[in-house]
């Protein structure tokens, strides 16, 4: 019998809590990640007021220097700790795959200086369209169409760009390059990026519409991912008949592997929280696992190095946390964590190699305190033990510490 009938895992994308022990091996604009501290630096530079996460125990997580504006709680309502990554990467897919039990020993490839000519030329030859070389670099998805959309409308060239994650994205105006044509080009791009030196996690079709100065991306986005190289705990759950619900980009991150119910993409964090709440309210969801990613922290504020915007985004989540809890049942377990860091005060624009926080809450708890410090995969091991399935490659369950 399961200790918790339902477990809900919410990933606050990029909300790290201090440099990891191996941060000296990871860099931003030539600067090692050793001084990165997403939550710490936001609390120092912008101020941070997250009373609902404080109640669970966020301020009690062990740190060399306490969070400046996040107090400790004498009698928290939950259990907390911080977790270390063992995989060789600090991207979204690596973090999520490890959280679900895998050890990624060969990281995906990222292209901070844009994609090599060999790849661009192959895409041009296949598509019969030229590629705008000036867009070939890490770029905001909205900024890239603002900057190059007018040119694409005139010439029909492709907008190919990347990000901090191991992705190749192709933006195309639907009136200039039909969606089905864009999909075929992306399928080809997927076929040539499945091994080194260009092993990419995802190819993303990014259709948009509108006129110069007023472009908007459409719902016709399509992701061409790769499946995890081995079964994750999601697969173990699905194979055992335990329903799994994906909210936000979780389904894309795992290429649908082990997901029995995809609840769709999020338009924003607020929309994602709405979708999570609707998922919690589903009458058929009496037992199982929900997995939510809220990406605005990372996409809108971490990469853009916007501390105040990041702070406000954390405030927004914290303000809505009581709504999530109000829609949980007494025998539900809520786990709040992250997948990597993205310190908005740091050099460069890339993710930062950090510990991630873990907050655990259930109305059924009679105790509280600290969970032993562990690793990302401890989350999946805990989920696995609760539902009576095998773990994946790595992870130690902390289920016994939750009382």
Swiss-Prot record:
Pathway where this protein functions: Carbohydrate degradation; 2-deoxy-D-ribose 1-phosphate degradation; D-glyceraldehyde 3-phosphate and acetaldehyde from 2-deoxy-alpha-D-ribose 1-phosphate: step 1/2
One GO BP: metabolic compound salvage
Known catalytic reactions: 2-deoxy-alpha-D-ribose 1-phosphate = 2-deoxy-D-ribose 5-phosphate; alpha-D-ribose 1-phosphate = D-ribose 5-phosphate
Top EC category: isomerase
An annotated Gene Ontology molecular function: phosphopentomutase activity
Binding-site residues, Mn(2+) 2: 298, 303, 351
The protein's Enzyme Commission number: 5.4.2.7
InterPro entries: Alkaline_phosphatase_core_sf, DeoB, Metalloenzyme, Phosphopentomutase_DeoB_cap_sf
Positions contributing to Mn(2+) 1 binding: 13, 339-340
Keyword annotations from UniProtKB, A to Z: Cytoplasm, Isomerase, Manganese, Metal-binding
Compartment(s) where it occurs, according to its Swiss-Prot or TrEMBL record: Cytoplasm
Cellular component aspect of the GO annotation: cytosol
CDD domains membership: PPM (cd16009)
Coiled coil: none
Necessary cofactors: Mn(2+)
Function: Isomerase that catalyzes the conversion of deoxy-ribose 1-phosphate (dRib-1-P) and ribose 1-phosphate (Rib-1-P) to deoxy-ribose 5-phosphate (dRib-5-P) and ribose 5-phosphate (Rib-5-P), respectively.
Family stated for the protein in its record: Belongs to the phosphopentomutase family.
Database matches in NCBIfam families: deoB (TIGR01696), PRK05362.1 (NF003766)
HAMAP family: Phosphopentomut
Protein name (database record): Phosphopentomutase
Species annotation: Streptococcus pyogenes serotype M5 (strain Manfredo)
Lineage: Bacteria, Bacillati, Bacillota, Bacilli, Lactobacillales
């Amino acid at each position: 019998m399961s200790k918790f009938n339902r477990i809900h895992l919410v990933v606050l994308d990029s909300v790290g809590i201090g440099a990891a022990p191996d941060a000296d091996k990871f860099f931003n604009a030539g600067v090692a990640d050793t001084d990165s501290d997403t939550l710490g630096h936001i609390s120092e530079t912008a101020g941070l007021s997250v009373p609902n996460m404080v109640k669970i125990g966020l301020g009690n997580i062990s740190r060399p220097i306490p969070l400046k504006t996040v107090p400790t709680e004498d009698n928290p309502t939950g259990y907390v700790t911080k977790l270390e990554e063992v995989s060789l990467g600090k991207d979204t897919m690596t973090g999520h795959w490890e959280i679900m039990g895998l050890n990624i020993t060969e990281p995906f490839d990222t292209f901070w200086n844009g994609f090599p000519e060999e790849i661009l030329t192959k895409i041009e030859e296949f598509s019969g369209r030229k590629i705008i070389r000036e867009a070939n670099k890490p770029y905001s998805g909205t900024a890239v169409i603002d900057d190059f959309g007018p040119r694409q409308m005139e010439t029909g060239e492709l907008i190919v760009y990347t990000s901090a994650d191991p992705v190749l994205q192709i933006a195309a105006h639907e009136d200039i390059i039909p969606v089905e044509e864009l999909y075929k080009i992306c399928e080809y791009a997927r076929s040539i990026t499945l091994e080194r030196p260009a092993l990419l996690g995802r190819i993303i079709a990014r259709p948009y519409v509108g006129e110069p100065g007023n472009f908007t991306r459409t719902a016709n986005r399509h992701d061409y991912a790769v499946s995890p190289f081995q079964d994750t705990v999601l697969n173990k759950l699905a194979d055992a008949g335990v329903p799994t619900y994906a909210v936000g980009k979780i389904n894309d991150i795992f290429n649908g592997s082990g997901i029995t119910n995809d609840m769709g993409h999020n338009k924003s964090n607020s929309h994602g929280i709405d979708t999570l709440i609707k998922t919690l309210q589903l009458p058929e969801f009496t037992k199982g696992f929900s997995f939510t990613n809220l990406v605005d922290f990372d996409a809108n504020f971490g990469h853009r190095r916007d501390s105040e915007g990041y702070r406000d985004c954390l405030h927004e989540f914290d303000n809505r946390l009581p709504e999530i809890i109000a829609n949980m049942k007494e025998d539900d377990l809520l786990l709040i964590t992250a997948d990597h860091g993205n310190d908005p005060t740091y050099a460069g624009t890339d993710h930062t190699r950090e510990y991630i926080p873990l907050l655990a809450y259930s109305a059924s708890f009679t105790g509280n305190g600290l969970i032993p410090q562990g690793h990302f995969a401890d989350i999946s091991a805990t989920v696995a033990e609760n539902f009576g399935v095998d773990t994946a490659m790595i992870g130690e369950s902390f289920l016994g510490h939750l009382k």
